[in-house]
Amino acid sequence: MALSIFVGTGVPDCPSETDVLDCPQPELTRYGEIADKYIKQLNDFYEHLSVEKYVIMPNHIHLLLWLKENKNKTDNGQSRTPVPTNIERAKSVCSQFVSTFKRFCNKEYGENIWQARFNDHIIRNRDDYEEHVKYIYENPIRWYYDELYTEE
């Protein structure tokens, strides 16, 4: 099961440091570098989650998370711990991931820059997955046309 996550900063005007059309991703600010570090660390921390794709934008982050199968099985092949296969459990695991991510980042930032809520979307099929991968990949290009984009 895969989920697409959007986490906003709550900072409406946080321009990138370079023209996004000249690079595959906007140059990361100090905040972006810290966010990148914790996305990678938390990817290793959560047993049932892997970060498949992500992009750090000037005022938000998109993540595509994959819920992994539990490899901790009993002799008869049953899971020892519940695998997040239903929607409620999947959203709970993602909420934990996002909450931990924001807490770690905010501690290092010395301030809270994240919006309280985030948006999630359960990936329903292969086409839905590919659409979200494409969206994440193309998001830096679309940023140039965003109403919040500003040039320095």
Task: Tell me the role of every PLM-derived stretch.
Residues 1-152:
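Short catalytic/metal-binding and nucleic-acid-binding patches
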